[in-house]
């Protein structure tokens, strides 16, 4: 009975049989690969490499002992025209293998083969023979995706955010895979820009998911990659109109996250550079959506401590809006005043630079709406102990348009800033600030001597009152001190 039960159990295969089976499978695989040659590379399913092979992903055929050699395919000039497109697709598949660049001594030959193949692909895309087929577009996007979409591993940046000056001085982090990445980006760029690319076909593969992943790469620490991404995204925005609202909204969300959550992102300057071109192309009158973007996304970008890294591009975008619609000047200036730095003098100089650019495009009605709070802030800048801040504020009078705006409204503005000007002439430590202040006073005195005289009299009257109040305050404290001393003595 036991024998009958045991005989029904499945027998465990011996290690010898297993080895024999594995060997025969390997031979079969080798034979199949040798028969099919390179033509099977295109259709072969990807096989994941071993951990130490140096390959991340690819289409190399397994043979039981490792992989078929990573070998160069024939050149385009060596095949008939009818075969060139098939060869192009095969070369794209070959370039889907991603190498490990952390060790420069590993896979040197294979890396060079891939680089040469990528160069051939760049030339082929740049000089196509007719429209690109859907298969070609699909394979190009697949190859690009395999190579560029990866997890970014940023270096710790806690200290970088604290001081933008340190961030600017540090050497940028360079991606070791750039010799391949650069060519991959070039292929993508040429595909998008090519007149032989059918937009209707391409948008199936360059879709919102692709664009979203592309936007994520802007946080790369390599400035060369961000520069390529900037060009690629700009081309996509220009060619694929269907993606325009999505791109604007996505950048908007990245700005929100940067301003209100992380204050960490490497690609803000590049995004703003793209937006500067986009804003320049906005049709008039501006849509409400675009005005909301200005108020909720661009103006708050003045708050982060790393403003210096992207201020030039931000200032250009802001100025573009005001030039397109001068009624936005009041909104922009009040936004600047709301974010005005209190303890960061270098940032304050940047704000004054931007303020001049905005005022350059501001018309009298908008200027009059915001001139009171604006020149209260300018007065504080005039009295700044940091000579560059005071000097930059005084330079506003060197701009003819701004000087005209001020002089048209001098009866409101001069009483606000006169105390600051007078204190500079009396107390400021810097000789350049002292001289510039005298020049500004002379401008007002030459245009409206009576107003200047009234403001001077008012200033002296206020100074006298302040001195009296100060003397009374001092006498009161002295009296309180005497009373306290008397009580202390009496208690003893």
Curated annotation (Swiss-Prot):
Native source organism of the sequence: Arabidopsis thaliana
Microbody targeting signal, short sequence motif: residues: 490-492
Tissue: Highly expressed in dry seeds. Expressed in roots, cotyledons, rosette leaves and flowers.
Pfam hit, one: B56
Region (Disordered): 1-63
Organism lineage string: Eukaryota, Viridiplantae, Streptophyta, Embryophyta, Tracheophyta
Role, per record: The B regulatory subunit may modulate substrate selectivity and catalytic activity, and may also direct the localization of the catalytic enzyme to a particular subcellular compartment. Associates with the serine/threonine-protein phosphatase PP2A catalytic subunit C and regulatory subunit A to positively regulates beta-oxidation of fatty acids and protoauxins in peroxisomes by dephosphorylating peroxisomal beta-oxidation-related proteins.
Protein name: Serine/threonine protein phosphatase 2A 57 kDa regulatory subunit B' theta isoform
Summary of the knockout phenotype: Reduced plant size and fresh weight.
Composition skew (Low complexity), residue ranges: 16-39
Biological process, per Gene Ontology: brassinosteroid mediated signaling pathway; negative regulation of brassinosteroid mediated signaling pathway; positive regulation of fatty acid beta-oxidation
Gene Ontology molecular function, alphabetical: protein phosphatase regulator activity
Induction section of the entry: Induced by epibrassinolide.
